[in-house]
Regions:
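Asp-based, Mg2+/Mn2+-dependent phosphohydrolase catalytic module
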Residues: 2-18, 30-35, 51, 181-182, ...
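Hydrophobic alpha-helical core bundles mediating ligand binding, dimerization, or RNAP-core interactions
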Residues: 75, 79-83, 99-103, 124, ...
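Substrate-recognition element of Asp-dependent hydrolases with the DxDx(T/V) motif
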Residues: 142-191, 199-202
Length: 288
């Protein structure tokens, strides 16, 4: 161990140590800045996008269920996998439709105050508990019911989704704005390879769409004005609410959301700012 004979020697050593520490601190700060820039390149680059300058749009928010992912086919697939394991005889198309049909009424209980704020995972489970009885799935274990409930975390994308999102991402910030909770949307993104820049949910505003507070919360978190944000959805009601909140709107036609037997009619052209057949078509219209 080194011994010091004078206070000057100690002071000199302290100054040297402080200098080295300060150099390391500055280096770490610089590395942190570069890491942040690498993690969020669009936050610095999106204003230079030619498409952004041309359209005035800097970010796109996407409805998810039905717009980005094919929920019905995915739930049917999950049900059939379970049926093979448990030797179940269930009409999984009817099951999927019944599960989705409970979605709106369940959210209305939250909107009306009958229920406190309850996220979509819990609302899905409330609906599923009734369906277990209705469809004769009483023999399922708690773990199996929970796994089935999380099928909504494992939904598959429409064929054009990932390619279209990647093109749009090259010119704009792209993010979700769904009634699904953040953990559900994050798991879904990992499962389906969805390249979001951010995951926004009505959960953040504690108000379900079409409440305007859901849209404006996402806009505020992006530090943008409503007119700089484009809401993308396959559901006209979602887009009408977004337009009332001041956002621009893009309708994407998803005729097979409810299956081949119930092809959805296309919304009348001209109501929204953009009307597209797919995400690839929307990217083309936006110059991405």
């Amino acid at each position: 161990m080194r011994h010091f004979d004078t206070k000057d020697e100690v002071s000199a050593l302290d100054a040297e140590a402080i200098g080295r520490f300060d150099q390391r601190r500055k280096a770490m700060q610089l590395m942190g800045l570069y890491s942040l820039m690498a993690a969020f390149p669009l936050l610095g680059a999106e204003t230079d996008s030619s498409s952004s300058q041309r359209t005035g749009i800097r970010a796109l928010l996407f409805d998810v269920f039905g717009t980005v992912v094919d929920w019905r086919s995915s739930i049917i697939r999950e049900g059939r996998l379970l049926a093979q394991q448990k030797n179940l005889q269930v009409d999984w198309g009817e099951f999927a439709d019944s599960w989705r049909a409970g979605y709106g009424p369940a959210m209305n209980k939250v909107r009306s105050g009958e229920l406190p704020w309850t996220d979509i995972d819990d609302l899905h489970r409330m609906i599923l508990d009734d369906l277990v009885i209705e469809f004769g799935l009483d023999d399922l274990s708690e773990a199996e019911i929970d796994h089935l409930n999380r099928a909504w975390h494992r939904l598959s994308a429409w064929p054009d989704t990932v390619g279209g999102l990647n093109r749009l991402k090259s010119q704009f910030i792209i993010a979700t704005l769904s009634n699904g909770n953040v953990s559900l949307l994050t798991n879904m993104a990992k499962h389906a390879g969805l390249p979001w820049d951010a995951v926004f949910s009505a959960e953040l505003a504690q108000h379900y769409k079409p409440d305007q507070r859901a849209y404006l919360k996402a806009v505020d978190l992006l530090n943008l004005q409503p007119a700089q944000v484009l809401m993308v959805a396959a559901h006209p009601g979602d887009l009408r609410a977004a337009a009332q909140a001041g956002l621009k709107t893009a309708y994407v036609y998803r005729p097979l959301e409810w299956g081949e037997g119930r092809i959805r009619e296309r919304n009348a052209a001209g109501e929204f700012d953009f009307d597209a057949d797919s995400f690839l078509d929307l990217a083309r219209q936006l110059g991405a």
